[in-house]
UniProtKB/Swiss-Prot annotation:
GO biological process, one term: cell wall organization
Subcellular location: Cytoplasm
Name of this chain's protein: D-alanine--D-alanine ligase
Cofactor note: Binds 2 magnesium or manganese ions per subunit.
GO cellular component: cytoplasm
Superkingdom of this protein's organism: Bacteria
The enzyme's E.C. designation: 6.3.2.4
Cofactor(s), names only, from the UniProt record: Mg(2+); Mn(2+)
Lineage of origin: Bacteria, Bacillati, Bacillota, Clostridia, Eubacteriales
Gene3D superfamilies in UniProt: 3.40.50.20, ATP-grasp fold, A domain, ATP-grasp fold, B domain
ATP-grasp domain: residues covered: 99-294
Pathway: Cell wall biogenesis; peptidoglycan biosynthesis
HAMAP family: Dala_Dala_lig
Organism name: Clostridium botulinum (strain Eklund 17B / Type B)
Catalytic activities: 2 D-alanine + ATP = D-alanyl-D-alanine + ADP + phosphate + H(+)
Length: 301
C-alpha cells in the first residue's frame, strides 16, 4: 500500500506539522508500506500531489488540515485518510461550536463568550464569569495568540491581538488546576498524560520545545479516573470523532474535571502526547501508526 504522509499546510502550525510528518515518515513500518512525503505549500497541492497514493496519513495541524477541508477533498477524490471526518474535524476546530455541543450534552466546560470581528466586547458578561479569563482565536491551535487576562483594562488589547489570527475570538473563564490529556482510540481511552508546564500555562513553547513542560503517564485516583474516562468518551461521541482524538482537560484542586478542547489531529513530534500515552501500554510509535491506518481504513466515509 502506498501511503502519502501529508504535512506542511498553510496554517500558523505549519512548522509543527512538518515535524510531525517527518517523525511519522521516520518511524512508519517501511517493510509494510511504500511511503511518500507530501508537503502542502498551497491549497491546490492537496489535489495535485496526492495522485497515485492508496492512503493519506494526515500530519496537518490547524486550519486547512484539522478543520475538515482536506478531509472533504480526500473524500471527494475517494482517497482513504486517517482520523476524523470533515464534520467532527470542523466542529472540534471551532471552539465555540464544540463548547455549545458539550454544554448541550451536559459535559462540563468553562463558561465563555464568542466574538465576531464587529461585535462589541460585553464586559458585564466577562465580569460575570470572573477574572482571570483566557482570550484566544476561536479556530486556533497550539496556544498561538492565547492570553491569560487578569484585569478588564487588558481585555481589548488581547482581543485585538487574537483577531490578527482569526475572524472570531473566544473569551472563557480561566480554570485553575492541573492539565491532563486523554487520548481516545476507537471507543477506549489510552493512559492519561499529566502536563506540568514550566510557564504559567501550556503555551506554544511549552508544547514544542524540549524541556518546556514535564509530561508523563499518570494514574488518577479511582473515582476521578472513572469520571475523566466517562467525560472523555462522552466528548468523543458527542463531537462524532472517529479513529482517534485527544481530549484535553483541566482538573481543579477539588478534583473537578473540565473539558478544554478536542484535538482531532494531535501532534506526532518526539515531544507529542499521544505517543507518550501509547508507550504507557507498550505500544511503540510505529505500532501506533499501524493502528491508526488499520482503524481508519475500516471507517465507511
Amino acid at each position: 500500500m502506498k501511503v502519502g504522509v501529508i504535512m506542511g499546510g498553510i496554517s500558523s502550525e505549519r512548522e509543527i506539522s512538518l515535524k510531525s510528518g517527518k517523525s511519522i515518515v521516520d518511524s512508519i513500518n517501511k517493510n509494510k508500506y511504500e511511503v511518500v512525503s507530501i508537503v502542502i505549500d498551497e491549497k491546490e497541492d492537496i489535489i495535485n500531489k496526492v495522485k497515485g497514493i492508496d492512503f493519506a496519513l494526515l500530519a496537518l495541524h490547524g486550519q486547512f488540515g484539522e478543520d475538515g477541508t482536506v478531509q472533504s477533498v480526500l473524500q471527494t477524490l475517494e482517497i482513504p485518510y486517517s482520523g476524523c471526518g470533515p464534520l467532527s474535524s470542523s466542529m472540534c476546530m471551532d471552539k465555540d461550536i464544540s463548547k455549545c455541543i458539550l454544554k448541550a450534552a451536559n459535559i462540563r466546560t468553562a463558561p465563555w463568550i464568542n466574538l465576531r470581528r464587529n461585535d462589541k466586547i460585553n464586559y458585564e458578561k466577562i465580569e460575570g464569569m470572573g477574572y482571570p479569563v483566557v482570550v484566544k482565536p476561536t479556530h486556533g491551535g497550539s496556544s498561538v495568540a492565547t492570553f491569560i487576562i487578569k484585569e478588564e483594562k487588558d481585555i481589548k488589547n488581547a482581543v485585538t491581538e487574537a483577531f490578527k489570527w482569526d475572524s472570531e475570538v473566544i473569551i472563557e473563564k480561566f480554570i485553575k488546576g492541573d492539565e491532563i490529556t486523554c487520548p481516545v482510540f476507537g471507543d477506549k481511552m489510552l493512559p492519561v498524560v499529566a502536563i506540568k508546564p514550566k510557564a504559567e500555562f501550556f503555551d506554544f513553547t511549552a508544547k514544542y520545545a524540549d524541556g518546556g513542560s514535564d509530561e508523563f503517564v499518570t494514574e488518577l485516583p479511582k473515582e476521578l479516573h472513572e469520571e475523566v474516562e466517562e467525560m472523555a468518551l462522552a466528548t468523543y461521541k458527542a463531537l462524532k470523532c472517529e479513529v482517534y482524538s485527544r481530549v484535553d482537560m483541566i482538573v481543579t484542586e477539588d478534583k473537578v474535571p473540565y473539558i478544554l478542547e478536542v484535538n482531532t489531529l494531535p501532534g506526532m513530534t518526539p515531544n507529542s502526547l499521544i505517543p507518550k500515552s501509547a508507550a504507557g501500554v507498550n505500544i511503540s510509535f510505529s505500532e501506533l501508526i499501524d493502528m491508526i491506518i488499520d482503524e481508519s481504513i475500516k471507517v465507511i466515509r
